[in-house]
Amino acid sequence: METRQINVVGKMVEIAEGATFADVAKHFSGTVNGPIMLARQKNKLRELHQKIRTCDDVTFYGIENDEAMRVYRRGVLILMTKAVYELWGSESLVVVEHSLQKNLYCEIRKPEMEMTEEVLAKIEGKMREYVAADLPICKRTMRKEDAREIARRQGMPDKDELFRYRRASNVNLYELDGFYDYFYGYMPASTGDLKVFSLMAYENGFLIRFPDQKNPEVLREFSNPKKISSVFLEQMHWCQLMGVKNVAELNHTLTQGKFGDLIRINEALHEKKIAEIADMIHQRLDKVRVVLIAGPSSSGKTSFANRLCIQLQVLGIQPHKISLDDYFVERDKTPVDENGKRNYEHIQALDLPLLNDDLKKMIAGELVDLPTYNFVTGKREYNGNRIQAKKGEILVLEGIHGLNDMLTSEIPAEQKFKIFISAMTQLNVDDHNRISTSDSRLIRRIVRDYQFRGRDAAETIRTWNDVTDGEAENIFPYQENADAIFNSATIYELSVLKQYAEPQLFAIGEDQPEYITAKRLIKFLGYFLAAPGTEIPNNSLIKEFVGGSCFKV
């Protein structure tokens, strides 16, 4: 038998001709954290079932890697969808609704089925049988027509419709012991390593809980974010009422000439929600003096703040917008991270004593000189920007630390109204493939950065992990402290953003480190029909990203 040598994780290894990545991975299980889920050669990811065809260096990824963790999740999903199909047949529609603290909330659409512990035990028991059997998960390439027939036979009309809009003539399905499913993204080679998971009854369905990426032998902690969950469930119900629950149904609105109506209904819903939040503030006007708005990157915070101020004025409340950016400490006092890099997202990067002192004076009705931060010199300046807030007027602050009480520690709790904003999309690719809220925000940011900040997509992707790490530390731990939550996602936006994002993503070469993410996003956007944004109103949050906003954003 012919053999050859390749460099695997820094070690020269002799492999047999025709060996797969899985064959080699068995000998390197101790080199990563948790089970190996994925391989990499040069700048391309490889599924473990694939044969090693080149002599390029090989790197293996365990679930501490985000791409490998996605593979693990999809592997557990096919265990679950097969189990439900085997237990109750094609009339039991399984829907993966959304992510909740990196767990997946799912429902089984079978009217007479109650999600009891007994039902969940049956599903999980089947799943663990498949794991114990170490069954292969096989990629099957077939004609689109054959894939649609399998989808219909297995009671998956969503996939049948999704494939209808697919441009390619072939489709890759994954087979697990005679059961077929479709997943957008890489899959495990077999079921044997998918040992750590659990099903937990939740709301009207159940959560699939996954391992902690840093400690893959145990489940990730779950703190039950009830406020965030209620927003997702409300959006899910609204999508069902609209008849646009997945990409195929969104594409259908385009082909039927109803896309403009969808835009107008989405925007009306946003306006209604913003008005409701303004009403909540108005009801507490005897105490509330400061409104704090916080949310992750590309949530549309600036446009939301402007629209909220308009709704407050409708109620006779005069708002005063204050930028937290103007309260940065001078550059030489900015905290640094472990690499010696200035960390502008650390709460101590803000002059908290000055901010609290100014807020107390404004609440007391004093005339206050507001600082302006000069980003060129890194110094604070005073340029005659003054505010004197009268009784009944509101101070509006927008920034990433708005929900953290440390920011406004000297302001009494009853004087503060906290708002969390994020793009929590409820639209799915199909019933088993959710759309990542993080990916949706990344696409927004790619479009905005290129349009208005002179950054190409590679630079945006390069810094995205730092952005999301900062959000995990500074924003998400405090989201349940919010008095109100605004979901800035729109059902229609990815059809519009597609035409702006795709050229930037295609510009990223295969030799660039950002290519892996770009390739994934290109494939994702390929599910959508492109739509013009001509009917989007100029006060829409989406205009903050594509241009044409009536606000200074």
Question: What do these predicted regions represent?
Answer:
Residues Q50-M69, A83, S92-Q101, Y105-K272, ...:
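Auxiliary tRNA-acceptor-end handling modules of aminoacyl-tRNA synthetases
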Residues V291-I293:
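Hydrophobic anchor at the beta1->P-loop junction of P-loop NTPases
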Residues K301:
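Conserved lysine of the Walker
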Residues V329, K333-V376:
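Conserved nucleotide-sensing/catalytic segment adjacent to the nucleotide-binding pocket
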Residues T408-V553:
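Conserved NTP phosphate-binding and transfer environment spanning the P-loop NTPase/kinase superfamily
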